[in-house]
Amino acid sequence: MTIKIAVLPGDGIGPEIVAEALKVLDCLRSDFGLAVETEHALIGGAAYDAHGTPFPKETLELCRAADSILLGAVGGPKWEPLDYSLRPERGLLGLRSELELFSNLRPAVLYPQLVSASTLKPEVVAGLDIMIVRELTGGIYFGKPRGRRINEDGEREGYNTLVYSESEIRRIAHSAFQIARKRNRRLCSIDKANVLECTELWREVVIEVGKDYPDVALSHMYVDNAAMQLVRNPKQFDVMLTDNMFGDILSDCAAMLTGSIGMLPSASLAESGKGMYEPIHGSAPDIAGRGIANPIATILSLAMMLRYSFDDAVSAERIGKAVQTALDQGFRTADIASEGTVEVGTAAMGDAIVAALRAV
């Protein structure tokens, strides 16, 4: 069977880092016989510039027809003055919603070669391996009513709605428990059940779902404490289950424990197993076009795609080993460079990983 991948480079550094992931994909195709086809489409600011919308119909149709999606990044200051409905990020949110990509997997793994790049002491972060499972299509980012208005005192007022249904919570909880079963069988659910009724329900439903997974140790933590614990003792966590907004914040916090946000991939999955894969970092418009962006997160996103959407653990492990080898050889992009390493650009890092892949 030939895998069909929709490629959405997006904005900023997106096209540069996606190009390196495609080098790796081409190597898997030419050297290891992976049957794969790719087709490109626009999303985000690039799509708005070309079509007047951040999420063109053609892009949605391509993504629906594809087996999986590889995304670069969206957004940038150029499009910030636009109406909220036309901003690049709305294209990404629309894609998640249309394809029902409800389960966002964000690993935070510290490579042994990069322990010194973390802002925390080596004894605190060495061996870090956390998986954050974030609900992606509900919560305050999608809740209605939302908007801005003038209140009865004549003041401007903004309002959003935090809402989750029982079925939405149950669905993401099952996803998190299943992932925990494949790891170290520990799941910590993050909420604010002491002040928010929505997350009080979240905790109740997670406890109910947990009864189906007696082999997984379930714990609960308020989000403010979770943020503190990620800095104080991050290795206490295995799998963290969060709602949309809490996960958005905590996953970036966890990412910086690893030394660079440029190292971390993510997966957004539908119940069918179809997924969208992207680095967790943004479009970094300040370095776009300079050839210095770190492509590793995007390359590892490709590895996650092969593992989670196509059950191809062999190819995923080949990519992971190739990344490890390139790091062992001392290659570093600017964001992870340190004394005694070889600082290289985006393309050179991609080339080093491809060379290591061929030698695996």
From Swiss-Prot:
Catalysed reaction equations from the record: (2R,3S)-3-isopropylmalate + NAD(+) = 4-methyl-2-oxopentanoate + CO2 + NADH
Gene3D superfamilies reported in the protein's UniProt record: Isopropylmalate Dehydrogenase (3.40.718.10)
Keywords, in A-Z order: Amino-acid biosynthesis, Branched-chain amino acid biosynthesis, Cytoplasm, Leucine biosynthesis, Magnesium, Manganese, Metal-binding, NAD, Oxidoreductase
Pfam family, one: Iso_dh
EC number(s) stated in the UniProt entry for this protein: 1.1.1.85
One Gene Ontology cellular component annotation held by this UniProt entry: cytosol
Residue numbers binding substrate: R96, R106, R134, D224
Localization in the cell: Cytoplasm
Class in the EC hierarchy, top level: oxidoreductase
Sequence positions that bind NAD(+): 76-89, 282-294
Manner of cofactor binding, per the entry note: Binds 1 Mg(2+) or Mn(2+) ion per subunit.
Highest taxon of the lineage: Bacteria
Binding site for Mg(2+): D224, D248, D252
Subunit structure: Homodimer.
PANTHER family, per database record: 3-ISOPROPYLMALATE DEHYDROGENASE
Protein name, UniProt field: 3-isopropylmalate dehydrogenase
Originating species: Methylococcus capsulatus (strain ATCC 33009 / NCIMB 11132 / Bath)
Gene this chain is encoded by: leuB
